[in-house]
């Protein structure tokens, strides 16, 4: 046997072993329920290849032998070796002879260019299948499109993202490191030390800084005192009350623009706003949150928690920061944010709601619109769980809302800071 013939035979065997490792034969049943067998080696066949029912191994062998166009000789010099699944690797010449005798045709082998074309077509179809919307995702109905447009218009009219109209607000005094709180604040805290002690059980030192950029380009900074005893929140309370009230007014106006909300009885409107205003504000604040710096960019104002694992409320800050980071990672569209606000607003289980069934139907309508929007605008299946994630986020937001309200009421009892609107929103809606 010439060296090149032996070398070619070894190459064909190695390629076949690689094919066998990559792809197992597929069982093909005959009409009577039996298994189809390879007409060359008797192994289980997986379909017609080059005009003959064969296994995957013989298909690959025949294609490689024809493309290489090598002369194969029977090492046993008989030329009539029996080809079976166990012996097919022993004599490549007789195996090729059996392929041709079985009817396999060289002209049916695809060229390399045709193979590449076919692979590209398969990849394209696979990609199109992945990016195609899920079953039932046929796009938004006209009613859903109108619903989203109404919410987007309401958001644009009532959400001052640059805080350009936020001008009348109080600022904390500028403290230096180690400076004590003003005497009037110390006196107010000493009036009811038991109450403040109760508040401090749920508090850890706060590390929040505030930066204000003036219209003339000047910059005013507030840094919390280095001494952290939990009371450094007090100087910021009036300012935080003002910025919260400004956001609350925007959210209330957002609700009033929505026709479905205006159609509800005034009592239900009040109950829904009392329950959802804080949640809707958090959703709006999230659009201005930078996860890398932990900063909220609110126009000329910038709020930064320097120590997110410490500061503010032990029961409030950690869940709130985690919530903002979790929500921001979803990379939501503006349409998804406004639909979340609507779902939060139209919650039928808010205290004091009378027309629960009506509100429940409205909430379901907004939820279905959100689901349809995701299905027709997000790649599938990469975002197939986004709707469920958003609904879980809204559930978590309800929990944060309850914790926040309790903390604010407790601080308010010890050191009144809330604006009239805040007091109205956080007042009891029972009965």
From Swiss-Prot:
- Residues annotated as DNA-binding are 35-104
On whether Phosphoprotein is a keyword of this UniProt record, the answer is no
The segment(s) forming the NR LBD domain are 143-430
Supply the PROSITE patterns for this chain.
Answer: NR_LBD, NUCLEAR_REC_DBD_1, NUCLEAR_REC_DBD_2
Ranges where the record places region Hinge: 105-142
Q: Which GO terms describe its molecular function?
A: DNA-binding transcription activator activity, RNA polymerase II-specific; nuclear receptor activity; nuclear receptor binding; RNA polymerase II transcription regulatory region sequence-specific DNA binding; zinc ion binding
Q: State the SMART domains in the record.
A: HOLI, ZnF_C4
One Gene Ontology BP term is:
xenobiotic catabolic process
Instruction: Please list the coiled coil stretches.
Output: none
**InterPro entries (alphabetical):** NHR-like_dom_sf, Nucl_hrmn_rcpt_lig-bd, Nuclear_hormone_rcpt_NR1, Nuclear_hrmn_rcpt, Znf_hrmn_rcpt, Znf_NHR/GATA
Keywords, A to Z, come to: Activator, DNA-binding, Metal-binding, Nucleus, Receptor, Transcription, Transcription regulation, Zinc, Zinc-finger
Motif (Bipartite nuclear localization signal) on chain: 63-89
Any single GO CC term annotated in Swiss-Prot or TrEMBL for this entry? nuclear body
> What family is this?
Belongs to the nuclear hormone receptor family. NR1 subfamily.
UniProt-recorded name of the protein: Nuclear receptor subfamily 1 group I member 2
């Amino acid at each position: 046997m010439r060296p090149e013939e032996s070398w070619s035979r070894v190459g064909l065997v190695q390629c076949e072993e690689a094919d066998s490792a990559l792809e197992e034969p597929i069982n093909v049943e005959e009409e009577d329920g039996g298994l189809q067998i390879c007409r060359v080696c008797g192994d289980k066949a997986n379909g017609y290849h080059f005009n003959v029912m064969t296994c995957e191994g013989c298909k690959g062998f025949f294609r490689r032998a024809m493309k290489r166009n090598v002369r194969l000789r029977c090492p046993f010099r008989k030329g009539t070796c029996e080809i079976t699944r166990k012996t097919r690797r022993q004599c490549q010449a007789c195996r090729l002879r059996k392929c041709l005798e079985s009817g396999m045709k060289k002209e049916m082998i695809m060229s390399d260019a045709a193979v590449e074309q076919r692979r590209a077509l398969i990849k394209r179809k696979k990609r199109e299948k992945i990016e195609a919307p899920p079953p039932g995702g046929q796009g938004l109905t006209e009613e859903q499109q109108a619903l989203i447009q109404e919410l987007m218009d309401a958001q644009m009219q009532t959400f001052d993202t640059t805080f350009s109209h936020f001008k009348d607000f109080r600022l904390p005094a500028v403290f230096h490191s180690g400076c004590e709180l003003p005497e009037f604040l110390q006196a107010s805290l000493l009036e009811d030390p038991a109450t403040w002690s109760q508040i401090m059980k749920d508090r850890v030192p706060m590390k929040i800084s505030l930066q204000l950029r003036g219209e003339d380009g000047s910059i005013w900074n507030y840094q919390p005192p280095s001494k952290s005893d939990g009371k450094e929140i007090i100087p910021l309370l009036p300012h935080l009350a003002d910025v919260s009230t400004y956001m609350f007014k925007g959210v209330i106006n957002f609700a009033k623009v929505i026709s479905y909300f205006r159609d509800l009885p005034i009592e239900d409107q009040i109950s829904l706003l009392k329950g959802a205003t804080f949640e809707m504000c958090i959703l709006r604040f999230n659009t201005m949150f930078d996860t890398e710096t932990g900063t909220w960019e609110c126009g000329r104002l910038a709020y930064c928690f320097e120590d997110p694992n410490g500061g503010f409320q032990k029961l409030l800050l950690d869940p709130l920061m985690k919530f903002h980071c979790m929500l921001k990672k979803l990379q939501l569209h503006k349409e998804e944010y406004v639909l979340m606000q609507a779902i939060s607003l139209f919650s039928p289980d808010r205290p004091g709601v009378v027309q629960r069934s009506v509100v429940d139907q409205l909430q379901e309508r907004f939820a279905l619109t959100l689901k349809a929007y995701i299905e027709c605008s997000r790649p599938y299946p990469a975002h197939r769980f986004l709707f469920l994630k958003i609904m879980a986020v809204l559930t978590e937001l309800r929990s944060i809302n309850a914790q926040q309200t309790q903390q604010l009421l407790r601080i308010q009892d010890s050191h009144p800071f809330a604006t009239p609107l805040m007091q109205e929103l956080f007042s009891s809606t029972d009965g």
